[in-house]
Amino acid sequence: MSGSDTSGSVHVDEHGHGHGKASSSYDGAGAPAPAPAPFQGHRKAGSGSSDVPFLLRSGGSGGDGLRRCLGLIDFVLRVAAFGPTLAAAISIGTSDERLSVFTNYFQFRARFDDFPAFEFFIVANAIAAGYMVLSLPFSAATIMSSKATGVKLLLLICDTIMVGLLTAAASAAAAMVYVAHEGNLRANWVPICLQFHGFCQRTSGAVIASFLAVFVLMVLIVMAAFTMPRRTHHTAS
């Protein structure tokens, strides 16, 4: 057959690089359009946590955000407990009232150093107030790092010691305040609050403030025990 159809002619590379390769004149006619590149956001990988508040970031563990929130509450409660302990120590330390009978040369006096229980109360509350201030940096460390197990354990032990110290001091002072208000007929102790109103008001308020600090410390102990990380034991399969 002498007829030649040029529509399907094969072009060969002139320089010999196209041996065995043929290109049809219709190569680009039915080529599909390139798929659009997937949309890439401006946010880099791993930067999605920047929009999450610091206290709620999990950091790879679901309970870390909750532990940071409880750490912040721990810090606030320590600041709040500093006030009652300091106020209780100052209130008892400045309690001094004199009662004049007939003349100024014959006086009765009610002062805190007349009662050893009140002296112990002042020392215990002063120690507790100082401890609250010193524990604030450690409490802040538990907020920044929820895995600070050693710091949490140290605070838990010291808080327990402070609870025992404050409870003993507040209980001893409360017993003295009760006797001052009610007296003891069997021991022939008369109530002195009928005459020394200011002294009894100061001591009563100080005891209430100290018990309030004890309650705050007990809450701190419960929170510390709740946020303490627990070890999981894996059994061999």
UniProtKB/Swiss-Prot annotation:
Pfam families referenced in this protein's UniProt entry, alphabetically: CASP_dom
Where is the region Disordered? 1-48
GO cellular component terms listed in the entry, alphabetical order: Casparian strip; plasma membrane
Keyword Membrane belongs to the record: yes
Q: Which residues lie on this side of the membrane: Cytoplasmic?
A: 1-69, 139-152, 227-237
* Annotated localization: Cell membrane
Q: What's the superkingdom here? A: Eukaryota
The biological process GO terms on file are: cell wall modification; cell-cell junction assembly
Topological domains on the Extracellular side lie at 91-117, 174-205
Q: Which residues cross the membrane?
A: 70-90, 118-138, 153-173, 206-226
InterPro entries documented for this protein: CASP/CASPL, CASP_dom, CASPL
Q: Which UniProt keywords apply?
A: Cell membrane, Cell wall biogenesis/degradation, Membrane, Transmembrane, Transmembrane helix
Membrane topology annotation: Multi-pass membrane protein
Recorded hits in NCBIfam families, A to Z, give:
A_tha_TIGR01569
| Assembly and oligomerization | Homodimer and heterodimers.
What role is this protein assigned? Regulates membrane-cell wall junctions and localized cell wall deposition. Required for establishment of the Casparian strip membrane domain (CSD) and the subsequent formation of Casparian strips, a cell wall modification of the root endodermis that determines an apoplastic barrier between the intraorganismal apoplasm and the extraorganismal apoplasm and prevents lateral diffusion.
Q: Which family does it belong to?
A: Belongs to the Casparian strip membrane proteins (CASP) family.
Spell out the protein name for this chain: Casparian strip membrane protein 2
Organism per entry: Oryza sativa subsp. japonica
